[in-house]
Each structure stands twice: as structure tokens, then as C-alpha cells.
């Protein structure tokens, strides 16, 4: 999964590729769309230091293909229409489009652990933040957009049985807290705290300078990012048809979330 900022940035840009009526809907339910752009990742934060049934839902939903997830979600929305739910789903589509396009390169590059999977994603976030003039990149709060009302949590939980609104609220809340913590100025203390969560958590701590271990992979990743953005409009159109009348999704949805 490209990290916090890459997904949020992608969703902001992808919204411009939607038809006007969907752009208006996304703007009305911006919180749901923004949270949707992080996909099922919030489950990983439900109880990050311990293995739990709810936390494992993150792995379960990442193993699903796009067809399995989006056709099932579309069926639920046809049975119980929800404009907020629709906005959330187009946000999740952003997450899926970016992950499914970038993950093959990330997995291949990190297969030998140099750089690590999360390390590369974090460095890609640092690159995009710097490119967008959000400097210093390591002091930006990537979790500031992660907010949901209780009603929003109820809406989101409907896409992830057997999750509940409480599951969603806790996962999103701790994810936002982690994002806020990652922007703290005391980097030594931050590194010490996140090392408690293991290698994956430690690699979430952004370097203050470019990470040379990732240098050769940033440009290819950015090209894949642009490719995913180009694909989004056609994928969104397919999702729209699926929502309207159950039209099956195409081969672009055959791969898993990763």
C-alpha cells in the first residue's frame, strides 16, 4: 500500500476524473471519500500490538480481488442505497487502483528486504510531500483527514462484515493518532516508540533526508502512480455500471488489493 499521503493525494486528483454528479456527491461526503481512500488499512490499527479477530480483517479484505469486494459492495448499495456509502466506495476505488498498480513493483523491490516494503512506501510519501511543497515532509501530519462521525462509521462498517461501527471508529481513530505521532519533532523518541511495534512500524518513521536505499525506485513508482490515475476514470465508469444494474466488472478488477 503506498502510504497515507500518496493515497490521500491520489484521491484528491482522481475526484477530478469523476462525472460532475459524482464530484458533487464526493464533496458532500468528503470525510467518507477521504477515509475510503485508505481502503481497509484501518483494520491494521484496531489493536496494532496484538493479533485480534477484528485486526485480521485487514488481511482478509486485502486478499480479496477487486471483483469480489466491489461487486459485493455494489450489491449492498443496490439493496440499501446510500449517497454517503457511494462516496466512500469511490474512495476505496482510489485505494484499489493505486495499490493494484504499484504493488507488483513494491513487492519485487522489497523481496530481499532492501528496501523494506513499508520503508519504500514511506519514502515515496516523503518524495510526494516535498514535491508538493509540504516541507519539512517528516513533520507533516498524514492523519489529519481521517475523521468520521458515528453515522459515517456505521456506513463504512456495512462494507466489511462482521465489522461494527465501533470497530471502524477505533481503527480510524488509532490510525489518525499514529499519523499525528509520526509528525512529532523528537525523531529519536518517535523511532523508539515505533520500534515497539516491530519492523513494519519502525519503517513508517520518515527519514529527515532522502533515503538512498529507495532512490532508484521513486521515479518508476511515480510513473505507476500516473498510470493508476489514468486508469481511474475507466474503472470508476465500470463501478458506476455495476452500481446501477449489476454489470460485471472487467479484468482490471481481477487482482487483489495486495
Can you say where each PLM-predicted feature lies in the sequence?
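N-terminal leader/auxiliary helical segments
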Residues: 1-89, 93, 97-258
